[in-house]
Amino acid sequence: MANLRKTHPLLKIANDALVDLPAPSNISVWWNFGSLLGLCLATQILTGLFLAMHYTSDISTAFSSVCHICRDVSYGWLIRNIHANGASFFFICIYMHIARGLYYGSYLYKETWNIGVVLLLLTMMTAFVGYVLPWGQMSFWGATVITNLLSAVPYVGGALVQWIWGGFSVDNATLTRFFAFHFLFPFVIAAATVLHLLFLHETGSNNPAGINSDADKISFHPYFSYKDLLGFVAMLLGLTSLALFAPNLLGDPDNFTPANPLVTPPHIKPEWYFLFAYAILRSIPNKLGGVLALLFSILVLMVVPILHTSKQRGLTFRPLTQFLFWTLVADMLILTWIGGMPVEHPFIIIGQIASVIYFTIFLVLAPLAGWAENKALEWT
Protein backbone atom coordinates (compact mmCIF):
# COMPACT_ATOMS: atom_id res chain seq x y z
CA MET A 1 0.00 0.00 0.00
CA ALA A 2 2.83 2.34 0.90
CA ASN A 3 4.34 1.60 -2.49
CA LEU A 4 1.10 2.35 -4.37
CA ARG A 5 0.82 5.69 -2.56
CA LYS A 6 4.19 6.68 -4.00
CA THR A 7 3.83 5.22 -7.50
CA HIS A 8 0.21 5.71 -8.62
CA PRO A 9 0.07 8.82 -10.89
CA LEU A 10 -2.86 10.39 -9.00
CA LEU A 11 -2.07 9.20 -5.49
CA LYS A 12 1.53 10.35 -5.92
CA ILE A 13 0.36 13.98 -6.30
CA ALA A 14 -1.84 13.72 -3.20
CA ASN A 15 0.98 11.99 -1.32
CA ASP A 16 3.51 14.70 -2.16
CA ALA A 17 1.07 17.42 -1.09
CA LEU A 18 -0.59 15.89 1.98
CA VAL A 19 1.40 12.94 3.35
CA ASP A 20 5.14 12.99 2.67
CA LEU A 21 5.42 16.76 2.25
CA PRO A 22 8.44 18.00 4.26
CA ALA A 23 7.23 20.87 6.48
CA PRO A 24 9.15 23.13 8.89
CA SER A 25 8.90 21.73 12.44
CA ASN A 26 8.19 25.13 14.00
CA ILE A 27 5.21 26.46 12.01
CA SER A 28 2.58 27.77 14.42
CA VAL A 29 -1.21 27.83 14.43
CA TRP A 30 -1.05 30.83 12.05
CA TRP A 31 -0.16 28.33 9.32
CA ASN A 32 -3.52 26.58 9.83
CA PHE A 33 -5.55 29.18 7.95
CA GLY A 34 -4.62 27.91 4.47
CA SER A 35 -6.24 24.53 5.13
CA LEU A 36 -9.14 26.27 6.91
CA LEU A 37 -9.74 28.28 3.73
CA GLY A 38 -9.85 25.01 1.79
CA LEU A 39 -12.46 23.74 4.24
CA CYS A 40 -14.43 26.99 3.92
CA LEU A 41 -14.41 26.70 0.12
CA ALA A 42 -15.57 23.07 0.25
CA THR A 43 -18.33 23.96 2.73
CA GLN A 44 -19.50 26.89 0.60
CA ILE A 45 -19.53 24.86 -2.63
CA LEU A 46 -21.43 22.03 -0.95
CA THR A 47 -24.06 24.17 0.81
CA GLY A 48 -24.29 26.42 -2.26
CA LEU A 49 -25.00 23.43 -4.50
CA PHE A 50 -27.95 22.37 -2.32
CA LEU A 51 -29.25 25.96 -2.20
CA ALA A 52 -28.99 26.24 -6.00
CA MET A 53 -31.26 23.17 -6.31
CA HIS A 54 -34.13 25.16 -4.77
CA TYR A 55 -33.30 28.78 -5.65
CA THR A 56 -34.86 30.60 -8.62
CA SER A 57 -32.98 33.51 -10.19
CA ASP A 58 -35.99 35.58 -11.20
CA ILE A 59 -36.85 38.89 -9.53
CA SER A 60 -40.47 37.88 -9.02
CA THR A 61 -39.60 34.64 -7.19
CA ALA A 62 -36.01 34.98 -5.84
CA PHE A 63 -36.98 36.36 -2.41
CA SER A 64 -39.85 33.85 -2.10
CA SER A 65 -37.59 30.96 -3.10
CA VAL A 66 -35.18 31.83 -0.26
CA CYS A 67 -38.16 31.93 2.14
CA HIS A 68 -39.27 28.56 0.73
CA ILE A 69 -35.79 27.09 1.31
CA CYS A 70 -35.87 28.20 4.95
CA ARG A 71 -39.44 27.04 5.62
CA ASP A 72 -40.22 24.04 3.46
CA VAL A 73 -36.96 22.39 2.37
CA SER A 74 -35.67 19.73 4.75
CA TYR A 75 -32.94 21.43 6.82
CA GLY A 76 -33.01 24.29 4.29
CA TRP A 77 -32.79 26.85 7.11
CA LEU A 78 -29.57 25.20 8.32
CA ILE A 79 -28.01 24.98 4.86
CA ARG A 80 -28.80 28.64 4.21
CA ASN A 81 -27.51 29.79 7.62
CA ILE A 82 -24.28 27.83 7.20
CA HIS A 83 -23.82 29.26 3.70
CA ALA A 84 -24.48 32.87 4.73
CA ASN A 85 -22.30 32.71 7.85
CA GLY A 86 -19.73 30.53 6.10
CA ALA A 87 -18.92 33.59 3.97
CA SER A 88 -18.09 35.53 7.15
CA PHE A 89 -15.81 32.74 8.39
CA PHE A 90 -14.24 32.56 4.92
CA PHE A 91 -13.23 36.22 5.14
CA ILE A 92 -12.09 35.94 8.78
CA CYS A 93 -9.75 33.13 7.64
CA ILE A 94 -8.63 35.11 4.57
CA TYR A 95 -7.75 38.20 6.61
CA MET A 96 -5.91 36.08 9.21
CA HIS A 97 -4.06 34.26 6.40
CA ILE A 98 -3.00 37.57 4.78
CA ALA A 99 -2.02 39.03 8.17
CA ARG A 100 0.18 35.96 8.77
CA GLY A 101 1.77 36.48 5.35
CA LEU A 102 2.47 40.15 6.10
CA TYR A 103 3.82 39.47 9.61
CA TYR A 104 6.17 36.63 8.73
CA GLY A 105 7.28 37.87 5.30
CA SER A 106 5.61 35.04 3.36
CA TYR A 107 4.99 37.60 0.59
CA LEU A 108 8.59 37.08 -0.54
CA TYR A 109 7.32 33.96 -2.31
CA LYS A 110 6.11 36.35 -5.01
CA GLU A 111 4.19 33.94 -7.27
CA THR A 112 2.32 32.36 -4.36
CA TRP A 113 1.56 35.82 -2.92
CA ASN A 114 0.32 37.32 -6.21
CA ILE A 115 -1.99 34.38 -6.92
CA GLY A 116 -3.21 34.81 -3.33
CA VAL A 117 -4.14 38.44 -4.08
CA VAL A 118 -5.97 37.28 -7.23
CA LEU A 119 -7.78 34.69 -5.05
CA LEU A 120 -8.80 37.47 -2.65
CA LEU A 121 -10.23 39.53 -5.53
CA LEU A 122 -12.09 36.49 -6.90
CA THR A 123 -13.53 35.71 -3.47
CA MET A 124 -14.65 39.32 -3.02
CA MET A 125 -16.39 39.27 -6.41
CA THR A 126 -18.07 35.96 -5.57
CA ALA A 127 -19.29 37.24 -2.20
CA PHE A 128 -20.60 40.44 -3.80
CA VAL A 129 -22.67 38.70 -6.51
CA GLY A 130 -23.87 36.17 -3.92
CA TYR A 131 -25.15 38.93 -1.63
CA VAL A 132 -27.42 40.13 -4.46
CA LEU A 133 -29.18 36.76 -4.89
CA PRO A 134 -31.75 36.84 -2.02
CA TRP A 135 -33.11 40.03 -3.69
CA GLY A 136 -33.74 41.90 -0.44
CA GLN A 137 -33.46 45.67 -0.09
CA MET A 138 -29.73 45.68 0.69
CA SER A 139 -29.11 43.12 -2.09
CA PHE A 140 -30.73 45.39 -4.67
CA TRP A 141 -29.29 48.70 -3.48
CA GLY A 142 -25.86 47.22 -2.83
CA ALA A 143 -25.81 45.91 -6.40
CA THR A 144 -26.98 49.30 -7.72
CA VAL A 145 -24.40 51.33 -5.81
CA ILE A 146 -21.37 49.08 -6.35
CA THR A 147 -21.98 48.37 -10.07
CA ASN A 148 -22.60 52.10 -10.56
CA LEU A 149 -19.01 52.75 -9.50
CA LEU A 150 -17.92 51.50 -12.92
CA SER A 151 -19.55 54.58 -14.46
CA ALA A 152 -16.50 56.46 -13.10
CA VAL A 153 -14.35 54.79 -15.77
CA PRO A 154 -13.60 57.54 -18.32
CA TYR A 155 -15.33 57.37 -21.73
CA VAL A 156 -16.65 53.77 -21.53
CA GLY A 157 -18.06 53.91 -17.96
CA GLY A 158 -21.74 54.40 -18.85
CA ALA A 159 -21.73 51.67 -21.48
CA LEU A 160 -19.87 49.35 -19.10
CA VAL A 161 -22.51 49.72 -16.37
CA GLN A 162 -25.40 49.06 -18.78
CA TRP A 163 -23.51 46.07 -20.19
CA ILE A 164 -23.16 44.54 -16.68
CA TRP A 165 -26.77 45.39 -15.78
CA GLY A 166 -28.12 43.97 -19.04
CA GLY A 167 -30.41 47.01 -19.28
CA PHE A 168 -30.89 50.50 -17.91
CA SER A 169 -31.15 49.46 -14.25
CA VAL A 170 -30.50 46.52 -11.93
CA ASP A 171 -33.24 44.16 -13.10
CA ASN A 172 -34.04 40.55 -13.96
CA ALA A 173 -31.13 40.22 -16.41
CA THR A 174 -28.74 41.39 -13.67
CA LEU A 175 -30.00 38.85 -11.13
CA THR A 176 -29.83 35.98 -13.64
CA ARG A 177 -26.22 36.71 -14.66
CA PHE A 178 -25.16 37.29 -11.05
CA PHE A 179 -26.49 33.83 -10.18
CA ALA A 180 -24.53 32.36 -13.11
CA PHE A 181 -21.36 34.15 -11.92
CA HIS A 182 -21.93 33.10 -8.32
CA PHE A 183 -22.20 29.46 -9.39
CA LEU A 184 -19.12 29.63 -11.63
CA PHE A 185 -16.60 31.62 -9.56
CA PRO A 186 -16.08 29.12 -6.70
CA PHE A 187 -14.79 26.60 -9.23
CA VAL A 188 -12.45 29.26 -10.66
CA ILE A 189 -11.31 29.89 -7.07
CA ALA A 190 -10.73 26.14 -6.62
CA ALA A 191 -8.59 26.08 -9.79
CA ALA A 192 -6.61 29.14 -8.65
CA THR A 193 -6.13 27.47 -5.25
CA VAL A 194 -4.45 24.52 -6.98
CA LEU A 195 -2.05 27.00 -8.64
CA HIS A 196 -1.50 28.71 -5.28
CA LEU A 197 -0.50 25.34 -3.77
CA LEU A 198 1.59 24.42 -6.80
CA PHE A 199 3.72 27.56 -6.41
CA LEU A 200 3.90 27.13 -2.62
CA HIS A 201 5.22 23.57 -2.97
CA GLU A 202 7.93 24.82 -5.35
CA THR A 203 9.54 26.65 -2.42
CA GLY A 204 8.08 24.99 0.68
CA SER A 205 6.53 26.80 3.62
CA ASN A 206 8.03 29.79 5.38
CA ASN A 207 8.31 29.61 9.20
CA PRO A 208 8.06 31.98 12.20
CA ALA A 209 11.85 32.45 12.44
CA GLY A 210 12.02 33.47 8.76
CA ILE A 211 15.15 31.39 8.14
CA ASN A 212 15.85 28.33 5.98
CA SER A 213 14.31 25.26 7.61
CA ASP A 214 15.81 22.53 5.41
CA ALA A 215 17.86 21.28 8.37
CA ASP A 216 14.75 20.61 10.46
CA LYS A 217 11.78 19.30 8.48
CA ILE A 218 9.05 16.86 9.54
CA SER A 219 6.47 15.01 7.43
CA PHE A 220 3.09 16.66 6.96
CA HIS A 221 1.29 13.48 8.05
CA PRO A 222 0.64 12.80 10.89
CA TYR A 223 1.91 16.00 12.54
CA PHE A 224 0.21 18.72 10.54
CA SER A 225 -2.69 16.65 9.23
CA TYR A 226 -3.87 16.23 12.84
CA LYS A 227 -3.07 19.85 13.63
CA ASP A 228 -5.23 20.87 10.65
CA LEU A 229 -8.03 18.55 11.81
CA LEU A 230 -8.03 20.29 15.19
CA GLY A 231 -8.39 23.61 13.36
CA PHE A 232 -11.25 22.13 11.29
CA VAL A 233 -13.10 21.10 14.46
CA ALA A 234 -12.58 24.52 16.06
CA MET A 235 -13.81 26.40 12.99
CA LEU A 236 -16.79 24.14 12.30
CA LEU A 237 -17.76 24.44 15.96
CA GLY A 238 -17.68 28.24 15.66
CA LEU A 239 -19.57 28.20 12.35
CA THR A 240 -22.32 25.84 13.49
CA SER A 241 -22.68 27.74 16.79
CA LEU A 242 -23.16 31.00 14.89
CA ALA A 243 -25.52 29.38 12.35
CA LEU A 244 -27.64 27.78 15.08
CA PHE A 245 -27.65 30.38 17.86
CA ALA A 246 -27.27 33.76 16.11
CA PRO A 247 -27.71 33.24 12.35
CA ASN A 248 -28.65 36.88 11.65
CA LEU A 249 -26.02 38.49 13.88
CA LEU A 250 -23.79 39.57 10.98
CA GLY A 251 -26.57 40.22 8.44
CA ASP A 252 -28.45 43.43 7.64
CA PRO A 253 -32.09 43.74 8.82
CA ASP A 254 -32.92 45.58 5.55
CA ASN A 255 -32.43 42.32 3.66
CA PHE A 256 -35.57 40.87 5.28
CA THR A 257 -37.54 43.33 3.13
CA PRO A 258 -38.04 42.36 -0.55
CA ALA A 259 -36.19 44.60 -3.03
CA ASN A 260 -38.04 47.81 -3.88
CA PRO A 261 -36.48 50.16 -6.47
CA LEU A 262 -38.74 53.00 -5.23
CA VAL A 263 -37.55 52.98 -1.60
CA THR A 264 -33.90 53.67 -0.76
CA PRO A 265 -32.65 52.28 2.60
CA PRO A 266 -31.36 55.02 4.96
CA HIS A 267 -27.83 53.54 5.07
CA ILE A 268 -26.59 51.49 2.12
CA LYS A 269 -23.67 49.36 3.26
CA PRO A 270 -22.09 46.04 2.25
CA GLU A 271 -21.47 43.02 4.48
CA TRP A 272 -19.06 43.63 7.41
CA TYR A 273 -16.06 42.07 5.62
CA PHE A 274 -16.13 44.78 2.91
CA LEU A 275 -16.64 47.74 5.25
CA PHE A 276 -12.93 48.67 5.46
CA ALA A 277 -12.71 49.01 1.65
CA TYR A 278 -16.09 50.79 1.57
CA ALA A 279 -14.81 53.31 4.13
CA ILE A 280 -11.75 54.00 1.94
CA LEU A 281 -14.05 54.44 -1.08
CA ARG A 282 -16.26 56.93 0.79
CA SER A 283 -13.34 58.88 2.27
CA ILE A 284 -12.55 60.45 -1.11
CA PRO A 285 -15.10 63.05 -2.28
CA ASN A 286 -14.35 62.36 -5.97
CA LYS A 287 -16.05 59.39 -7.69
CA LEU A 288 -13.13 58.20 -9.84
CA GLY A 289 -10.67 58.89 -7.01
CA GLY A 290 -12.78 56.82 -4.63
CA VAL A 291 -12.99 53.90 -7.07
CA LEU A 292 -9.21 53.96 -7.59
CA ALA A 293 -8.63 54.08 -3.82
CA LEU A 294 -11.03 51.13 -3.40
CA LEU A 295 -9.13 49.11 -6.02
CA PHE A 296 -5.74 50.06 -4.65
CA SER A 297 -6.76 49.19 -1.08
CA ILE A 298 -6.55 45.55 -2.24
CA LEU A 299 -3.93 45.86 -5.00
CA VAL A 300 -1.51 47.55 -2.55
CA LEU A 301 -0.81 43.99 -1.35
CA MET A 302 0.85 43.34 -4.74
CA VAL A 303 3.53 45.98 -4.08
CA VAL A 304 4.41 44.73 -0.57
CA PRO A 305 7.14 42.33 -1.85
CA ILE A 306 8.69 45.12 -3.96
CA LEU A 307 8.83 47.48 -0.96
CA HIS A 308 10.47 44.96 1.38
CA THR A 309 13.68 46.68 2.56
CA SER A 310 14.67 44.66 5.64
CA LYS A 311 17.51 42.14 5.76
CA GLN A 312 15.28 39.97 7.94
CA ARG A 313 12.27 38.19 6.53
CA GLY A 314 9.59 38.28 9.24
CA LEU A 315 8.76 40.69 12.04
CA THR A 316 9.73 38.28 14.84
CA PHE A 317 12.84 40.33 15.71
CA ARG A 318 11.76 43.71 14.30
CA PRO A 319 9.96 45.79 16.99
CA LEU A 320 9.57 48.94 14.83
CA THR A 321 7.74 47.17 12.02
CA GLN A 322 5.83 45.08 14.58
CA PHE A 323 4.41 48.32 15.95
CA LEU A 324 3.42 49.37 12.40
CA PHE A 325 1.78 45.99 11.77
CA TRP A 326 -0.44 46.24 14.86
CA THR A 327 -1.19 49.88 13.99
CA LEU A 328 -2.40 48.61 10.60
CA VAL A 329 -4.62 46.01 12.30
CA ALA A 330 -6.13 48.71 14.55
CA ASP A 331 -6.52 51.00 11.52
CA MET A 332 -8.44 48.32 9.61
CA LEU A 333 -10.77 47.83 12.59
CA ILE A 334 -11.39 51.60 12.66
CA LEU A 335 -12.08 51.58 8.89
CA THR A 336 -14.50 48.66 9.36
CA TRP A 337 -16.35 50.63 12.04
CA ILE A 338 -16.44 53.82 9.90
CA GLY A 339 -17.72 51.89 6.85
CA GLY A 340 -20.87 51.02 8.79
CA MET A 341 -21.47 54.58 10.01
CA PRO A 342 -23.49 57.32 8.26
CA VAL A 343 -21.60 59.91 6.18
CA GLU A 344 -21.53 62.77 8.69
CA HIS A 345 -19.16 64.51 11.10
CA PRO A 346 -17.00 63.18 12.82
CA PHE A 347 -17.09 59.90 10.85
CA ILE A 348 -16.01 61.53 7.57
CA ILE A 349 -12.75 62.95 8.95
CA ILE A 350 -11.97 59.79 10.98
CA GLY A 351 -12.42 57.71 7.80
CA GLN A 352 -10.16 60.05 5.80
CA ILE A 353 -7.40 59.97 8.43
CA ALA A 354 -7.67 56.16 8.74
CA SER A 355 -7.48 55.80 4.92
CA VAL A 356 -4.35 57.97 4.73
CA ILE A 357 -2.75 55.95 7.56
CA TYR A 358 -3.65 52.67 5.78
CA PHE A 359 -1.78 53.60 2.59
CA THR A 360 1.05 55.40 4.42
CA ILE A 361 1.90 52.29 6.46
CA PHE A 362 2.08 50.10 3.34
CA LEU A 363 3.84 52.52 0.99
CA VAL A 364 6.02 54.72 3.24
CA LEU A 365 6.37 53.73 6.89
CA ALA A 366 6.97 49.97 6.54
CA PRO A 367 9.82 50.36 3.98
CA LEU A 368 11.34 53.16 6.10
CA ALA A 369 11.11 51.07 9.28
CA GLY A 370 12.82 48.16 7.50
CA TRP A 371 15.62 50.47 6.40
CA ALA A 372 15.96 51.93 9.92
CA GLU A 373 16.15 48.43 11.43
CA ASN A 374 18.93 47.53 8.98
CA LYS A 375 20.84 50.60 10.16
CA ALA A 376 20.26 49.62 13.80
CA LEU A 377 21.73 46.17 13.05
CA GLU A 378 24.87 47.83 11.64
CA TRP A 379 25.33 49.92 14.80
CA THR A 380 25.23 46.99 17.22
Swiss-Prot record:
Heme b b566 binds at residues 97, 196. The keyword Chaperone does not apply. Signal peptide: none annotated. InterPro entries: Cyt_b/b6_C, Cyt_b/b6_C_sf, Cyt_b/b6_N, Cytb/b6-like_sf, Cytochrome_b, Cytochrome_b_C_euk/bac, Cytochrome_b_N_euk/bac, Di-haem_cyt_TM. A ubiquinone binds at residue 201. Its main location: mitochondrion. Keywords: Electron transport, Heme, Iron, Membrane, Metal-binding, Mitochondrion, Mitochondrion inner membrane, Respiratory chain, Transmembrane, Transmembrane helix, Transport, Ubiquinone. Heme b b562 binds at residues 83, 182. Component of the ubiquinol-cytochrome c reductase complex (complex III or cytochrome b-c1 complex) that is part of the mitochondrial respiratory chain. The b-c1 complex mediates electron transfer from ubiquinol to cytochrome c. Contributes to the generation of a proton gradient across the mitochondrial membrane that is then used for ATP synthesis. Heme 1 (or BL or b562) is low-potential and absorbs at about 562 nm, and heme 2 (or BH or b566) is high-potential and absorbs at about 566 nm. Belongs to the cytochrome b family. The cytochrome bc1 complex contains 3 respiratory subunits (MT-CYB, CYC1 and UQCRFS1), 2 core proteins (UQCRC1 and UQCRC2) and probably 6 low-molecular weight proteins. This is Cytochrome b. It comes from Salmo salar.
